[in-house]
Amino acid sequence: MNRTMLQGKLHRVKVTQADLNYEGSCAIDQDFLDASGILQYEAVDIYNVNNGQRFSTYAIAAERGSKIISVNGAAARCACEGDLLIICSYVQMSDEQAREWQPKVAYFEGDNQMKRVAKAVPVQVA
C-alpha cells in the first residue's frame, strides 16, 4: 500500500503579488523552495489563512533572496497581496517508508522572514 505524505511546507508566507494575467503557477523565492524541498514545476496545494480558500497549482522559481510569493493566473482570484498562505507538496511512498518519514517545514513571520526550518510538524497540545 502507498501513502501520500507531506513532503515540504512553507508555513505562513505572505503573498507579495497576485497577477491574474501571468500564465498560472505560484512563483516562490528559490531560497524558500530549497528550504522546503519543493521543486520547480512541482504540484502544490495552497491554503489561504485569510479567506479559507484551498487551491492547487504548481511552483515556479522566483529570484533567490527576493522573498517573492506571487500567485498567478486563475489562482490570483484566490489570494490577495498580504494574505498569509500555507504551501504544501506531497509525496507517495510505501507504508514502511511513511512510518519513518519526516517532512521539511519552513516557518515564516513578518514580511517573509524565514525564522526556522524543521524536519517535523510539532505535536498539537491542549
Swiss-Prot record:
GO molecular function: aspartate 1-decarboxylase activity
Annotated Pfam families: Asp_decarbox
Highest taxon above the source species: Bacteria
Keyword list, A-Z: Autocatalytic cleavage, Cytoplasm, Decarboxylase, Lyase, Pantothenate biosynthesis, Pyruvate, Schiff base, Zymogen
Entry GO terms, CC: cytosol
Substrates-to-products reaction catalysed: L-aspartate + H(+) = beta-alanine + CO2
Annotated localization: Cytoplasm
Posttranslational mods: Is synthesized initially as an inactive proenzyme, which is activated by self-cleavage at a specific serine bond to produce a beta-subunit with a hydroxyl group at its C-terminus and an alpha-subunit with a pyruvoyl group at its N-terminus.
Cofactor binding comment, as recorded: Binds 1 pyruvoyl group covalently per subunit.
Tagged with keyword Kinase: no
Binding positions (substrate): 57, 73-75
Signal peptide: none
Physiological role: Catalyzes the pyruvoyl-dependent decarboxylation of aspartate to produce beta-alanine.
Assembly information from the UniProt record: Heterooctamer of four alpha and four beta subunits.
Protein name (Swiss-Prot/TrEMBL): Aspartate 1-decarboxylase
